[in-house]
């Protein structure tokens, strides 16, 4: 039981985070709950943030790779917006990143990391790369 919390999967490249979060977990959710999830790459955040924020379950791969976003002269941090609204609306987040918690804090700030800890279970992927 996840107690309504999503997942924040952290680890070096090649540890299996993307496969688990974009292939296996969505298959389980769709099969067992009849819910459809949309899977996005972090670079999609800039162009699709408004659409993404409307979903009940959101899977974002490779958090920390997205660039700065300016819309109508306004600087936005789509990932921070996503985390903020996910907390307010109860959106389930499934996230992967190669960044450490400290690197996430530097990139997005303490507020975002604190909210992430509140709404996700952090799972660390350790070991050697599974890629050949």
Question: Where in the sequence are the language-model features?
Answer:
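The conserved Walker
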Residues: 13
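Phosphate-binding P-loop
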Residues: 1-4
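Conserved lysine of the Walker
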Residues: 17
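Hydrophobic anchor at the beta1->P-loop junction of P-loop NTPases
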Residues: 9
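AAA+/P-loop NTPase substrate/partner-engagement loops
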Residues: 26-66
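Hydrophobic positions on the alpha1 helix immediately C-terminal to the Walker A/P-loop
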Residues: 20, 24
